[in-house]
Amino acid sequence: MLKRWILTLFVVCLGFSQVAKAELELVITEGIDSARPIGIVPFKWHGEGKLPQDISAIISSDLQRSGKFSPVATNKMPQTPYKDSDINYEAWTKMGVDAIVTGEVKLNAQGKYEVTYKLIDVVRGQLTKGQSKALDESGKLVLTRDHILVNKVASLSTKQLRKYAHRISDVVYEKLTGERGAFLTRIAYVVVNDKAQYPYQLRIADYDGYNERLVLKSKQPIMSPAWSPDGKKLAYVSFENRKSQIFIMNIYTGKRELIASYPRHNGAPRFSHDGDKLAIVLSKSGSLQIYVVDLKTKKMSQITRGRANNTEPFWAPDNKSLIFTSDRGGKPQIYRVNLGDGSTKRLTWQGSQNLGGQITPDGKYIVMVNRSETGFNLAKQDLETGAVQVLTKTLLDESPSIAPNGGMVIYSSIYRKQNVLSMVSIDGRFKARLPATNGRVRAPAWSPFL
């Protein structure tokens, strides 16, 4: 039963398109009215024509996708100041906005873009009129202007503008939430285009679909990409030699290393969080079983045994246990195995099937594919209480992958009879999809912090 399900999952675990500025166009499908309002004021451009990148629009989109912020539309802003001295604090606080981002861009003498931005605490600014004071080390009363939370300047090339906009988003997100932002991360995914010379393509892009790059192309299936913790390598399954094999590839040099090429099935690679080991699934002894390969010594240890099929391993944050999918109870459910003593515990009970589990970076939740009367949808389970929350309402969801800060999940779903990538915030309130312009997109993997 599980073996048939795994084969079906592998056969469709493919998809993608051609090189372009953004092959994946992110479309918001469900926003958040109750998210925290924030003002991302259009950056003032001191130059001719248009900026190559709309920095404020990128920041606004990033923060909205996090599910925690609701940027005020430009046409609804009470004003569009680019200097903190021009801010009408009362006008912003009346809208419920407690923070705004302002900035300006100009060309410097070296021909680069000089970007200046500030993150401003509107409430603090209203209380102090922007003129807060405090005693310095010598006991002298000085102007602190502590309503300005961030004040930075950078000199950038045209190619660096978009990346720096994501950097600003990371800074703003962390300053206001206390959590690290994940807007400078990437996603890897597989695309299949039946009409292409090489139908199967492994690609990477910025988390929002921009700056897409081809990593590998093949006439045979590619599936199950997984990032190394340093973001430099991808493990994946290839059928290029007419059988399943597991490789690790350096995405910058293209150098590959063959990890597993045993009889029958080789699949589901997953790096440990320290990068020293790789969990894989083999069927060389009959049923699907989980093994761990030491990447330095190449020594391999078998983790699961028995007649049941065990697959989809994922490491706990402390690397001391794995969660995995098993049909030992009749239908696929998620279990945890202690790597020290081999003890195993079933974790999921709600829903006829639960599979594809991943643990959030803080170790508090499992995100998984949950089958219920409504179909296959993503769900989140609290590991302490066992409470389950269904996160999505899309069709035939699979392959969830969690952002390194735990704030968002990317996954594969069906939209208009086509495989697309979709996103959902970890609380289920914000949803978006990234339909490709050409090809079927599957098997997403969110990178670590880069």
From Swiss-Prot:
Please give the chief subcellular localization of this protein: periplasm
Keyword Signal in the entry? The reply is: yes
Q: Which interval of the chain is the signal sequence?
A: 1-22
Localisation: Periplasm
What domain of life is recorded for the organism? Bacteria
Query: What keywords are annotated for this sequence in UniProt?
Result: Cell cycle, Cell division, Periplasm, Signal
Record GO biological process: cell division; protein import
Q: Which GO terms describe its cellular component?
A: periplasmic space
Q: So what family is this one in?
A: Belongs to the TolB family.
Subunit arrangement? The Tol-Pal system is composed of five core proteins: the inner membrane proteins TolA, TolQ and TolR, the periplasmic protein TolB and the outer membrane protein Pal. They form a network linking the inner and outer membranes and the peptidoglycan layer.
The task this protein performs is described as:
Part of the Tol-Pal system, which plays a role in outer membrane invagination during cell division and is important for maintaining outer membrane integrity.
Name used for this protein in its record: Tol-Pal system protein TolB
Q: Which gene encodes it?
A: tolB
